[in-house]
């Protein structure tokens, strides 16, 4: 085990959705935040064993996630139809963007694996993920969330 050999590395894959929340994303965003919190706690617990922990956050990555977002039907609770239409439209618009990441992802993962950092690190891959992370840090929680609300709930 890592503790027995006194070194090792965990690279946990997550999403910028752990830091940036959108309407109707309760389950998705909360699981991504859970990976972030879990990883940070692991880093504290394992640092004395020379075991590093980092997370890699993607934004819009080359997956079928957006294609699998579905609208509710008449047999389901439809109170959110208007909002679901808006969010679905936003996801459809961005589904083709920023999806040329496989090479960048592979290079970043190899770089992290070859150069473990003793301190916990979050790595962000992709233009949209980096932009969201920077904007949230620059504007702070209150202003950033105001912008998200204006953009998604208008």
Tell where the protein language model's regions lie, with residue ranges.
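Active-site-adjacent segment of SDR/Rossmann-fold oxidoreductases
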Residues: 2, 20, 41-52
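Rossmann-fold scaffold of SDR-type NAD(P)-dependent oxidoreductases
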Residues: 12
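Residue(s) in the substrate-gating loop at a strand-loop-helix junction
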Residues: 15
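Active-site loop immediately N-terminal to the catalytic Tyr-X3-Lys motif
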Residues: 20-26
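Active-site helix of classical SDR
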Residues: 31-34
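C-terminal beta-strand-loop-alpha-helix "lid" module of Rossmann-like NAD(P)-dependent dehydrogenases
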Residues: 45-96
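Core catalytic loop region at the nicotinamide-binding pocket of NAD(P)H-dependent oxidoreductases
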Residues: 53, 93-137
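Non-catalytic terminal and boundary segments that flank Rossmann-like NAD(P)-dependent oxidoreductase
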Residues: 142-154
